[in-house]
Amino acid sequence: MIDRYCRPEMAAVWADERRLALWLEVELAATRARESRGEVPAGTVERIRSCTRIDLPRMLAIEAEVHHDVIAFLSMVAETAGDDARHLHTGMTSSDLVDTALACQIQEAGRVLVAEIHRLRHACWTLAQKHKHTAMVGRSHGVHAEPITFGLKVLIWSEELGRGLDRLQTALMGCAVGKYSGAMGTLAHLDAAIEDDALEALGLEPEPIANQVVQRDRHAALLCAIAVDRKSTR
């Protein structure tokens, strides 16, 4: 992202370091669910968490050798987590990790957007109240028309922002899904209850019917909602 066009709080969501931190959380969520069922030795998750340090330069160096970002990430974690790292990624495919972490990032970014729209809508409401008796020339067909108030004009903006907020929140809900169902989405290697518990810990729902990835119509709907909302703020 280009820093001068991005708010610091949004840049932080999409920083590589944050992405990798979420990758670790996604891995640990599944491992914790397995640990609670006795499939992994007790204390494994906390030992991994306490030992692991996100080292982006080291991961990139490994990736340059193995040409695979997830393998590079897991190798980086294993360098500090040691033998416990063997319990990570069991039964998962790369997209289980990447798409689920992306869903977490989208929800974080969505909270920033929603807060800003609320702030902008409140500013419009305040401005509308201030100018509810401020007369101005209305426009129709590109020419002067009957008089209105500036407050009315601003209220139209506020209402449009409200509809945009509804669209955005609906689209964000549609993206609040992840998966641990494996390469073909068949849960061949992890129990569905483990997927449910891991995703619940991350604040997500399971993709009801999946293949290798979370289906992209979810992301397309979000981008469309953002594009329409962008029109409202121009």
Enumerate the predicted regions with their spans.
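A short, charged helix-loop
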Residues: D196-V214
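Conserved small/polar residues in nucleotide/adenosyl-binding loops
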Residues: K231-T233
